[in-house]
Amino acid sequence: MSDVIRLLPDSIANQIAAGEVIQRPASVVKELLENALDAGASIIRLDVREAGRELIRVTDNGKGMSQSDARMAFERHATSKIASFQDLFSLRTMGFRGEALASIAAVAQVELLTRRAEDELGTRLTINGSEVGEVATVTSPLGCILCVKNLFYNVPARRKFLKSNETEFRHILTEYERVALVNPQVAFSIYHSGELVQDLPPSPLKKRILDVFGKRMEKDLIPIGMKSPITNISGFVGRPDGARKRGALQYFFVNGRFMRHPYFHKAVMAAYEAIIPQGTMPNYFLYFDLEPSQIDVNIHPTKTEIKFSDEQAIFKLIGVVIREALSSSNAVPAIDFDRKELIDIPAYQGPGKNVVRPPVDLDPSYNPFKETGLTEPIRSSRRQSPDMGWNELFKQFEAKRDAEKMAEPPIRSEELFASTDFTPSAVSATPSTDMLCYVHRGRYLVTTLSRGLALVDFHRAHKRILYDRFMADESRRHIEQQQLLFPELLEFNPSDASAVKAAVDELQSVGFDLSPLGVSSYSLLAAPVQIIDCAADVVRDVIHTTLEDGRSSHEQMLELIATQIAEYQAIPCGKTPTAEEASDLLAELFASNDSTYTPDGKLIVSIIEEADIARRFE
């Protein structure tokens, strides 16, 4: 029997390895940008076409490569970053494995043009699917120009699973922003199909954040900083009032590298506990700088998951530095007063006249204890209690109470507990003020049904009602629009702007009027009348949710917009409704076709069956 185990050719092995490193066009962008930074570039330009399917080109002014290095760079595990295993624990570069270029060349058509400062001529190299084509000496600018064309051209299955151009370009922008945020000293620019999307000049860190995400964040950023033997922490955190339900900007960086770290995220959220509304997320940009030997980057192909030697200590430091920053910036109300800010008010000196003491006449013969004004002396209530007639007093009280009871008709249990069925057909659509309900802890309504007791979350119930009203108005084309007194400027990063373009028709159809002002800015001119005061927040939440969920159809967008409008218009949690409001809300809720769940699938009503209640008293 012949042997069945064989060694794979390098081309196939590279394609398999590319599956871990190169997952989509954004993966190529990440690797090429990091290579440019490792080469010492101070100016980096990124060009993409068809969201990276046709072309990804990175141009930099870095060190460049010799012809032999250019050829060797596309071999598997060829790197200039390490020479021994111990070098892994002293890395300051972004790349080190020598897998990226080989993986890219295995699934795309690659062209490299490079030149070093000491060389008069440069090198042009072409590779198609791991096969080296032309290697020539040509004129070339300083640095590197690396073009990746027709990604996954030889792996149709991988190309088929790519998402839409809008989705893939958003992923590219995400990787681009991560690299730009951690390298503010480098100039970046990105072009899509020849059109400039974003141009970032070298700048301080705060300005780089504002250039990427918009100037509206300026008032939200609080600087933080701490130096310790374990790690240095710097960056910015958001004010509590800037916390969002969706689309919060949350970034961790360590030694110039973006990372994900759920444990450190918990530390940030713990620092904001009780000072931001439940369900919201703060913005933060945290930068860690520590010895490379204290972290392990080599645990994931994308190098975004990093282990720390002392994570618990860093967890505590994160909480300390954020709380100090929030406290010192007056973002959190403090109990102590700042005496440095007190106004020095001089003591009142008067008009300058001497105050004359008024004359007082005394009657030396007056004795206030001589006469009491009572006909009889005061007796001790403890010793003389029978004389006060308490028994007679209680007898009179009980007789009066019994007389009032006899005058009132007896209350029957059928009248005390309403028998409302929990079905739309059993309840009139007209709100009734006769429905009995009890407000529990300012959030839940307790009412009676024929099946038992119903516990209703009135915030969610109101949200359901408002959603149904809006959808009914939309179906009748009866949405009332109102112009804003002053148009509101909405600034987005490029990824948000592309989502607005995709959703603008849907927003226009339901009463919003958005006028484009540039690549990533819009003017909000009008909105549905019921949410005119929070229209900008609704638009932002709709866009962020679209980015996260990828909703694109008319029905999905309409449901999303209606849900967000209902969320902002609903009675807030903690605000107790009046008895009439609660009764009307229950009547309208039970008349709805779907009164059990909110539009986003959260439970509204929980029923305690009559049998369960009886069982508790057996």
From Swiss-Prot:
Keyword field: DNA damage, DNA repair
GO CC term, one of those recorded: mismatch repair complex
Pfam (any one): MutL_C
Biological-process GO terms, alphabetical: mismatch repair
Single GO term (MF): ATP hydrolysis activity
Family named by the database record: Belongs to the DNA mismatch repair MutL/HexB family.
NCBIfam families listed in its UniProt record: mutl
Function recorded in the entry: This protein is involved in the repair of mismatches in DNA. It is required for dam-dependent methyl-directed DNA mismatch repair. May act as a 'molecular matchmaker', a protein that promotes the formation of a stable complex between two or more DNA-binding proteins in an ATP-dependent manner without itself being part of a final effector complex.
Protein name: DNA mismatch repair protein MutL
Gene name per UniProt: mutL
